[in-house]
Amino acid sequence: MDYQTIPSQGLSGEICVPGDKSISHRAVLLVAIAEGQTQVDGFLMGADNLAMVSALQQMGASIQVIEDENILVVEGVGMTGLQAPPEALDCGNSGTAIRLLSGLLAGQPFNTVLTGDSSLQRRPMKRIIDPLTLMGAKIDSTGNVPPLKIYGNPRLTGIHYQLPMASAQVKSCLLLAGLYARGKTCITEPAPSRDHTERLLKHFHYTLQKDKQSICVSGGGKLKANDISIPGDISSAAFFIVAATITPGSAIRLCRVGVNPTRLGVINLLKMMGADIEVTHYTEKNEEPTADITVRHARLKGIDIPPDQVLLTIDEFPVLLIAAAVAQGKTVLRDAAELRVKETDRIAAMVDGLQKLGIAAESLPDGVIIQGGTLEGGEVNSYDDHRIAMAFAVAGTLAKGPVRIRNCDNVKTSFPNFVELANEVGMNVKGVRGRGGF
């Protein structure tokens, strides 16, 4: 399926974006190995998260999926209750699922194969294979990419590990393995990454120690059931935040969005560029802060993106670069080489698409330089990347003509009702097949 857009006359209204993808992954995994029954409200029913649910079900977890209400009811099997799956576990397109499951499965008393789609089979896994091996895990792969064959070892040993680069997925993978290891596992990271795993461990009553740069867990503990309500995903909200910011006449409110400080880079950077964003009704529930976000149209200016904001914005850069494309002046992004090993090479994909829409964009080895200008209509390729597809749908709100975005089926991995919500607030996005459109 493709997307086709026509320019918007302005966004308005109030919407609630679906539940946070990162928290959904971690929550269902942890409650599956907890003791007792947990209800998970606001679970993201995207393909990536449902791949995690399926994998856990294949290992004996009892998970009732109430899809139309975004609810899971999970009867935990306890720390030692998982069973060997009958076949390889398919993680689909999800790098988070395969890395978290690798940590969980490294300490089980059975062997497992983890695989995924063609995109996932190009994603780098050496970053988890090396430290898990130090803990006593044995993992076979060809070229350090999936499929991964994990030979479970119930006698893992805790380690003190310095992450070479900050990564919430790697940190979480090792913490999960540490739950099954003898002794203490401590992870030190060079900069703060998203801390949903740590917050969830606390919510499910697992003892951990944390200081500014390190997090430690000791093996042998138990997770206890505890109902949880997942906030809206700020990575999904970002598409509407940028769309309202760049489209004249816009004013929208996004309800109950997760505003974890480790995820606020996109708001920080947009405010540096001159955006009119107001965060109100701040509350904290289930260890996670949430708030309403009101956004009004504003004129933006280009900036040099500070290095300390890169990790906090890593998933939102595709749509942030759309904001840069219409800002006055130049925007420079560096220290973001991680964007090249996402679902696609996001630096190359964004530069290619922006150039096709008339924007001067230059690729750097670790980033991009964008000279703000006027978005023209045209046709771009999403390269089967959900965030690229939605970013260019946002570009279509302000482009001078229709924008066609190729290969958008993958949006279902993270935001199944994107088109519905986009049109609800006035973005004019249509899913089309063949050569049809507006």
Curated annotation (Swiss-Prot):
Binding site for phosphoenolpyruvate: K21, G95, R123, Q169, R346, R387
Keyword Amino-acid biosynthesis part of the UniProt annotation: yes
EC number: 2.5.1.19
Lineage: superkingdom: Bacteria
Gene Ontology biological-process annotations: amino acid biosynthetic process; aromatic amino acid family biosynthetic process; chorismate biosynthetic process
One family name in Pfam for this protein: EPSP_synthase
Location, primary (coarse class): cytoplasm
Catalytic activity entry: 3-phosphoshikimate + phosphoenolpyruvate = 5-O-(1-carboxyvinyl)-3-phosphoshikimate + phosphate
SUPFAM superfamilies assigned: EPT/RTPC-like
InterPro entries according to UniProt: Enolpyruvate_Tfrase_dom (IPR001986), Enolpyruvate_Tfrase_sf (IPR036968), EPSP_synthase (IPR006264), EPSP_synthase_CS (IPR023193), RNA3'P_cycl/enolpyr_Trfase_a/b (IPR013792)
Compartments reported by the entry: Cytoplasm
Pathway: Metabolic intermediate biosynthesis; chorismate biosynthesis; chorismate from D-erythrose 4-phosphate and phosphoenolpyruvate: step 6/7
Residues the record lists as binding 3-phosphoshikimate: K21, S22, R26, S167, Q169, D315, K342
Keyword entries, A-Z: Amino-acid biosynthesis, Aromatic amino acid biosynthesis, Cytoplasm, Transferase
Enzyme class: transferase
GO MF assignments: 3-phosphoshikimate 1-carboxyvinyltransferase activity
Active site location: D315
GO cellular component: cytoplasm
Subunit structure and binding partners: Monomer.
Function recorded in the entry: Catalyzes the transfer of the enolpyruvyl moiety of phosphoenolpyruvate (PEP) to the 5-hydroxyl of shikimate-3-phosphate (S3P) to produce enolpyruvyl shikimate-3-phosphate and inorganic phosphate.
Family as reported in the entry's similarity comment: Belongs to the EPSP synthase family.
Protein's name according to its UniProt entry: 3-phosphoshikimate 1-carboxyvinyltransferase
Gene name per UniProt: aroA
